[in-house]
Amino acid sequence: DFMAIVLYSDYESIGTVETGSELVNKLISNIEWGMKGNFLDVPTDCPQRDERMGWTGDTQVFSATASYLADTYAFYRKYLYDLYQEQLLAGGMVPEIVPTFGPTKCSCAWGDAACIIPWNVYLFSGDKTILENQIESMKAWVDYIRRIDGDHHGWRQVFHYGDWLALDRTGAAAKQRVWSD
């Protein structure tokens, strides 16, 4: 026998979904526990690996789901403050990881966290203060892109992750394995 203690940032659960499907309910439970496993001071990218870094792209993609499941206002307010502090040091660029640990780069979607996360938190909370607090960060990100883009479309010429986890076509056998009991 063993006991585990789950460490995560304090937040109040406010939403969930229950269906008539045991498999879908298990998926929802896994999402809720995955969020707990990834919300410890900063939103980390994946609970199954040792990396545990605050990838901005991952958290911006999950921010609406997180805000549906929990009151994320205080958690994201703190994270967005940290993001802006890193952004100030990088001349408006939003690092791909916050907090950063040395030299970093940015990418579309990852840097867009500066605009998408506050917007999602606002949509779910109705509190415009998050937008007021982050407007300088949002503007700095857009200004950074404009500055890099310049007259020669430089933004298109720098590194971007793109859709690095695109789903490829799968055959009937793979689909059957996924959906069978």
Feature-to-residue mapping (PLM):
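Active-site acid/base region of carbohydrate-active enzymes
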Residues: 3-30, 36-37, 43-95, 105, ...
